[in-house]
Amino acid sequence: MVQMQTYLTVADNTGGKIAECIKVLGGSKKRSARVGDIIVIAVKQAIPNSPIKKGEVHKAVVVRTSKEIRRKNGTYVRFDDNACVILDANLNPRGKRVFGPVARELRDANFMKVVSLASEVI
């Protein structure tokens, strides 16, 4: 579960390192985001000389959450951190690589490009 003011790891090679959720998109009163939901982030830390700068605002998709995800077969999946992948205006990933595992729920949310860039899908 990611809500406003949650800090997330940026799991791609755009140059951002840490981001803060400033809005959860979808619905008028939606308070928390799960894996596959789109959020608006503010970049809090960035790598020097990268295209993403500190203070910039972007859309991102949540790829990992510390809060467990319940699946239809009764199993639960959780990760060590909250992570996101920065998106462009067409909701495609801005980076060319995705670091770490991502949840299989991204397939259901139609983020196939993120799934194909990921090294591991759990």
Swiss-Prot record:
InterPro entries: Ribosomal_uL14, Ribosomal_uL14_bac-type, Ribosomal_uL14_CS, Ribosomal_uL14_sf. Gene3D superfamilies: Ribosomal protein L14 (2.40.150.20). The keyword Ribosomal protein applies. One of its GO terms (biological process) is translation. PROSITE patterns: RIBOSOMAL_L14 (PS00049). Keywords: Ribonucleoprotein, Ribosomal protein, RNA-binding, rRNA-binding. GO terms for molecular function: large ribosomal subunit rRNA binding; structural constituent of ribosome. GO terms for cellular component: cytosolic large ribosomal subunit. Part of the 50S ribosomal subunit. Forms a cluster with proteins L3 and L19. In the 70S ribosome, L14 and L19 interact and together make contacts with the 16S rRNA in bridges B5 and B8. Binds to 23S rRNA. Forms part of two intersubunit bridges in the 70S ribosome. Belongs to the universal ribosomal protein uL14 family. This is Large ribosomal subunit protein uL14.
